[in-house]
């Protein structure tokens, strides 16, 4: 390998395959970058040329989104990627009534 060490995956560097989303209560969710880009807000934070520190670290802190909501958001990212342009029947995405309002506010903020 000519002294060059190539690393694929992980959360570090501009070509990282994963990003780290951190909830208001400190839980870390490592998700595929492609899935996180479902969110217009995260996409803007991770793609602008040096506008946001998140672009360099591939970490996004959400001071207003608790882990029980952010975990559901991450599930939705996977659901959205899986069923966008799918020819199969799309199952309903389950949402517990107890978190519906918080999830709606998070979805509005995240633009997803």
Curated annotation (Swiss-Prot):
Alphabetical list of Pfam families matching this protein: Skp1_POZ (PF03931)
Modification after translation (UniProt): Ubiquitinated by the DCX(AMBRA1) complex, leading to its degradation by the proteasome.
Superkingdom of this protein's organism: Eukaryota
Pathway: Protein modification; protein ubiquitination
Subcellular compartments: Nucleus
GO biological process: protein ubiquitination; regulation of transcription by RNA polymerase II; target-directed miRNA degradation; transcription initiation at RNA polymerase II promoter; ubiquitin-dependent protein catabolic process
Chain's role: SIII, also known as elongin, is a general transcription elongation factor that increases the RNA polymerase II transcription elongation past template-encoded arresting sites. Subunit A is transcriptionally active and its transcription activity is strongly enhanced by binding to the dimeric complex of the SIII regulatory subunits B and C (elongin BC complex).
Protein known as: Elongin-C
Primary gene name: ELOC
């Amino acid at each position: 390998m000519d002294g060059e060490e190539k690393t694929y995956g992980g959360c570090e560097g501009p070509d990282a395959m994963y990003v780290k989303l951190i909830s208001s209560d400190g839980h870390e969710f490592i998700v595929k970058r492609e899935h996180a880009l479902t969110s217009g807000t995260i996409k803007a934070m991770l793609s602008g040329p040096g506008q946001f520190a998140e672009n360099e670290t591939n970490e996004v802190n959400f001071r207003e989104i608790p882990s029980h909501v952010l975990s559901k958001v991450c599930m939705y990212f996977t659901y959205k990627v899986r069923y966008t342009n799918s020819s199969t029947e799309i199952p309903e995405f389950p949402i517990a009534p107890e978190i519906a309002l918080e999830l709606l506010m998070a979805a509005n903020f995240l633009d997803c």
